[in-house]
């Protein structure tokens, strides 16, 4: 499957579960601290799993489905603070995903539970494939996950991905993510070259050249 960051391989098992071999993933920074309004110093790791992530362990509101609004506010403040302080991924890559972790609701089905803030101030209903890849890379870099060892990541809704890594001989690992998914829609994106916002609305800069109503 072609993705914006490269081709990923997908395997479908007879039981309906899908395995995805993701792009090379790695931890870029550890012990990164940012001052977050109303929360003070928050420490985390910066990692690449197909997107740039800031991963936070056991800080902020409890990772529970009843705290989605509070978790959204907390992670959004982290993202804004990272941008304010110029903290980025490699080559200035914007950290546009914030992932916080807490204990699982049931240790029999998962090793950890997460909440993932995505661009647009949305959150991921799943454990997040790229986010789980970033987590696996951090665990491996910290010596907490051996090659081939299984990690079970639960989402804020308690859906679970299983993940492991294959080493590459350098700083990166190849994550293998296994889980279940359902097709819930199809879309065709049309990029009109005359549309100034065809690639989305981010930092629009000087919009004085745009006509009213565009």
PLM ranges: what are they?
Residues 1-214:
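Active-site proximal loop and beta-alpha junction motif in alpha/beta enzyme cores
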